UniProtKB/Swiss-Prot annotation:
Keywords: mRNA processing, mRNA splicing, Nucleus, Spliceosome. Involved in pre-mRNA splicing. Residues 1-37, 235-307, 402-443 are annotated as: Disordered. This is Pre-mRNA-processing protein 45. It comes from the Eukaryota. Belongs to the SNW family. The keyword Nucleus applies. Residues 235-283, 294-307, 430-443 have a biased composition (Basic and acidic residues).
Length: 443
């Protein structure tokens, strides 16, 4: 490692401020030789201007890394001690004597005494106490704890001085015309479709007023054209208003005529009904063939309505109605193949899954463990069984005699006819409904 100082790598200074520093920077062979350029330069420098070189900005430790700085001497240490002690003594002497000796003051009894009197509100007796006030013990070297607040100047009651200025003068008509700026009117765009006067279009055009001192003169023909356009527009608006009014009156007239016509038709129909109500009905006027045709028409209409009603029913209801029409015995459980088995509430499985072991006796199935189905009886109970004609004592002749002599529907009303007994209650209800509909249509 190079032990040469850092300052030796730099060019030598032209002039050193102190001889000790200059001797430290100069090499031994060059000591005593002062450069001529430095002398001439120093002689040319004016008085009062310090001579600063680059060497002055280098720290002392970097100028010579092997330089030893001597420790302070005993005399310097003693001077610093005496100066510090004198400052602290000055601080302690400025404090009150009570702060420096609090214990002795308390023992000696120094302090201020005051008499404190109190009066009882109930007994109205006064008691006095003597209180001794002693200064609080404080550190003399502790900084002051009193917060210095900024002194705010009190508000002054002086009124605010008004700003005096001359009153505004009213502009004359000529000045207002000079300051008037016409509104910008485009000759190409008019999105809102406003009708703009020609005077405003000319006022914004600078070609007619190059000097800018007066309003451009408008030709009389332009004024006539503007007036003609306004008059034509007013006439067109008046015509549109008249046509709208005529159209409105015509519509009101048509509505009034329709109302009168409807009122007249209603009056005619009312008079016709009253006339027919007064005249007696002559049955001989009706032709027998007309009565037959009307009867056939009514029967055909009833048949079409019945077919329409049956087409809207479900399959089971349609089969039930067909069975009633044919006079067959139909129960609630089975209707021509549309079976609706009764549900067993405690069975929540399919018995077909448990009846696959029915053929256990068949040879060739030795892996079958059970000899019969498990829940076969429940499946048999769910099958349809007729409630009548069951038992060994019923033979074919007894069954036939019961079927021929049985009365299928009992009479609940003694005034009902035989035809009503042979029909079901549902069919009677539908026939009554159809009869009521025919009566309404005839009326």
């Amino acid at each position: 490692m190079n032990s040469a100082p850092f300052s030796t790598l730099l060019p030598p200074p032209k002039k050193e401020s102190s001889p000790t520093v200059a001797s430290a920077h100069q090499s031994p062979e060059n000591q005593g030789d002062e450069p001529v350029a430095g002398i001439v330069f120093d002689s040319l420098q004016p008085d009062g201007i310090p001579n600063v070189s680059f060497q002055d900005f280098i720290p002392i430790r970097q100028r010579d890394f092997n330089m030893e700085i001597p420790l302070p001497s005993k005399q310097d240490i003693e001077q610093t001690f005496q100066r510090t002690k004198a400052y602290f003594d000055k601080l302690l002497n400025n404090k009150p004597a009570t702060n420096s000796r609090p214990s002795t003051d308390a023992r000696s009894g120094k302090g201020n005494y005051i008499e404190y009197k109190t009066t009882d509100a109930l007994t109205n007796k006064s008691t006095s106490r003597i209180i001794k006030i002693v200064d609080h013990v404080a550190d003399p070297l502790q900084p002051s704890q009193i917060k210095r607040k900024k002194v705010v100047a009190p508000p002054t009651d002086e009124p605010v001085a008004p700003i005096l200025h001359s009153a505004t003068e009213k502009l004359t008509k000529e000045q207002r015309e000079q300051w008037r700026i016409p509104s910008a009117v485009s000759n190409w765009k008019n999105p809102n479709g406003y009708a703009i006067d020609l005077e405003k279009r000319i006022a914004i055009d600078g070609r007619y007023n190059r000097e800018g001192t007066a309003i451009p003169a408008v030709n009389e023909k332009l004024l006539e054209l503007t007036n003609a356009l306004e008059e034509a527009e007013s006439k067109a608006r008046e015509e549109v208003r008249n046509r709208a009014e005529a159209r409105k009156q015509e519509a009101e007239q048509q509505v009034r005529l329709k109302e009168d016509k409807l009122r007249e038709l209603a009056q005619r129909s009312r008079e016709e009904r009253q006339r027919k109500r007064r005249q007696p009905i002559d049955h001989e006027e009706y032709d027998e063939s007309a009565i037959i045709r009307q009867t056939e028409r009514n029967e055909k209409r009833d048949q079409m309505k019945n077919d329409m009603r049956l087409s809207k029913l479900s399959t089971a209801d349609r089969l039930r109605v067909l069975a009633h029409a044919q006079g067959r015995d139909v129960s609630e459980k089975i209707i021509l193949g549309a079976a609706k088995p009764s549900e067993v509430p405690d069975v929540h499985y399919d018995s077909r899954l448990l009846t696959k072991g029915a053929g256990t006796a068949v040879p060739g199935a030795p892996e079958q463990v059970y000899d019969g189905p498990l829940f076969a009886q429940n499946a048999m109970d769910r099958l349809y069984k007729p409630a009548r004609f069951t038992g060994p004592e019923n033979d074919a002749l007894d069954i036939l005699s019961k079927m021929t002599s049985e009365q299928r529907f009992e009479d609940q009303d003694p005034g009902t006819s035989v035809d009503q007994q042979q029909t079901s209650p549902g069919m009677q209800k539908s026939d009554a409904k159809q009869d009521s509909e025919h009566d309404l249509k005839r009326t």
